[in-house]
Amino acid sequence: MSSRIDRDVINALIAGHFADPFSVLGMHQTQAGLEVRALLPDATDVWVIEPKTGRKVGKLECLDARGFFCGVLPRRKNFFRYQLAVTWHGQQNLIDDPYRFGPLIQEMDAWLLSEGTHLRPYETLGAHADTMDGVTGTRFSVWAPNARRVSVVGQFNYWDGRRHPMRLRKESGIWELFIPGAHNGQLYKFELLDANGNLRIKADPYAFEAQMRPETASMICGLPEKVTPGEERQKANQFDAPISIYEVHLGSWRRHTDNNFWLSYRELADQLVPYAKWMGFTHLELLPVNEHPFDGSWGYQPTGLYAPTRRFGTRDDFRYFINAAHAAGLNVILDWVPGHFPSDEFSLAEFDGTHLYEHSDPREGYHQDWNTLIYNYGRREVSNYLVGNALYWMERFGIDALRVDAVASMIYRDYSRKEGEWIPNEFGGRENLEAIEFLRNTNRIIGEQVPGAVSMAEESTDFSGVTRPPETGGLGFWYKWNLGWMHDTLDYMKLDPVYRQYHHDKLTFGMLYNHTENFVLPLSHDEVVHGKKSILDRMPGDAWQKFANLRAYYGWMWAFPGKKLLFMGNEFAQGREWNHDASLDWHLLEGGDNWHHGVQRLVRDLNHTYRHHKALHELDFDAYGFEWLVVDDNERSVLIFVRRDKAGNEIIVASNFTPVPRHDYRFGINQPGRWREILNTDSMHYHGSNTGNGGVVHSDEIESHGRQHSLNLTLPPLATIWLMREGE
């Protein structure tokens, strides 16, 4: 036995309390010659083998019955490639020694990871299949700077933390190890002796695949190939493009009728994708697909930020789904949750025994609304972990946009907190300066690294400049959900039409701030849960009036400036709230033609008409693209406006939000001529009363509303009509 290895070191190594296994294990130069040491629990016989010849070079002596072997090779002076012939339970196995390989992470990578400027940390950290010195295996690395010891445990070593302790790179706090023979498909975790001497078993923060709940192991999985976005996909995200988003929860869009089980990614590719295309939507937005332990979180409490959930299939199945959407001309938006994470023991919480990813003070690090933990954006490695994740989904899966969840909870330290429950920033303010900088940096990097990709913010306050450049004080998002518009218009629509005249401003107020941001008009999943009722059920009146109100509202929404978003089920007026544990109520579309079919046809026509006419989308964020024609007729609850494209082509939109038809309704227009009714939400095609204007109307040289020419229309009850000028 070498004089350098004393009994205390062996005991610590076997007990899993030794932080530097490479200083003991592997091949070492000693005064007696080359010495090979190995920790092989349960082994009875160990020989050193030279692979070139297959010859036994020397036998290792068992110095501790718990599995510590050591032997000197006196005839050898220079290091050489070797293998170990190990006998376990009477059977000999030829293995490569993990402790004969040098450091894995390049110095530049380690420096960038420590600086928080490694744009793609997932290419270095985590588990990656590799070949080293002709040996195939997997290199593992994990950031845990305060751990006393870290081991890889998995199916390849009986989940025994003694067998594969890792090397600590002190300059970066990263532990690393190459394990020969570990391969794709095998499960693994990291076993940590944490800063307090406690044992923790953690999933890999960078795992590309993970087990489905209730299991929590990570899975070795190759890094997906890069996806290059085509020109059409890039154009589809632009400010002047028609954007109509179908928001989907993959687990409840449709289920198998025989067992209520989810559709797989591939089944969704075959069913959801063609349906969304047929309906005329331009984008699919997916509620979070990151692996998550609790179905009831809808994915908004992820534990596997880099792993698509296994509920619906494999990582490659998810890529198949994305490819199918792109082939159908649909861009894909992913709901992304960088604002918080769950406190499950196997995940990021107190990862190495310290508050590594989260703040230590609960006034900063604990989200009391959701019982989750808040990322410490001021720690470079943490913000780098998140920025890298954004690029990962876009570059490796072809995700076209990220919709960032709960931005307000990120940028305000006092979000949902009472006095005394939060800590001011360094200037005494309520803004989370680190989170703001993180969002700006993420958006900047997306813009620089992924051409055509965009981000969207769900931001519920009046924070100024969410979609403005960081250099002007903004956050740098491309789009922001207009939650104010959504609340105001839904509050208006749920009123009995008799009372709407007193709340006329709820429909007009949105234009006062419309050009402060680049808005998306969202009727999202949040509006059909928690006792809020379905959108249909919020409408007043009897069944006929409920459907008429809904159709009028959709006609108004699709014509109003801003991109469109509709949660699944709303396109056919589902009557009950959304239930994440069940399929949508597709049975409402079974049997004979009914009101639900009418709404579905309307949404389809709205989408296709909206996409066809540039006036409805080209200048959403330019004042020239919108003009009120009638804004003050609150007594009759009538509103009329014009949408306009760059060439000056106009579409007139007129809404009557009472059940009383308005005959001979005259209003001034900008462009005289022949106007065709291109959409009428009261059409019998949508199960309306079929009141209208016979298809075409001609303007009169009669002054009205301060304009020289005017139209005289019949405005159907509880309806919106669109008119297009088609000639003099």
Curated annotation (Swiss-Prot):
GO terms for cellular component: cytoplasm; cytosol. The active site is at 405 (nucleophile), 458 (proton donor). Its EC number is 2.4.1.18. InterPro entries: A-amylase/branching_C (IPR006048), Branching_enzy (IPR037439), GlgB (IPR006407), GlgB_N (IPR054169), GlgB_N_E_set_prok (IPR044143), Glyco_hydro_13_cat_dom (IPR006047), Glyco_hydro_13_N (IPR004193), Glyco_hydro_b (IPR013780). Coiled coil: none annotated. Keywords: Carbohydrate metabolism, Glycogen biosynthesis, Glycogen metabolism, Glycosyltransferase, Transferase. Monomer. Catalyzes the formation of the alpha-1,6-glucosidic linkages in glycogen by scission of a 1,4-alpha-linked oligosaccharide from growing alpha-1,4-glucan chains and the subsequent attachment of the oligosaccharide to the alpha-1,6 position. This is 1,4-alpha-glucan branching enzyme GlgB. It comes from Salmonella typhimurium (strain LT2 / SGSC1412 / ATCC 700720).
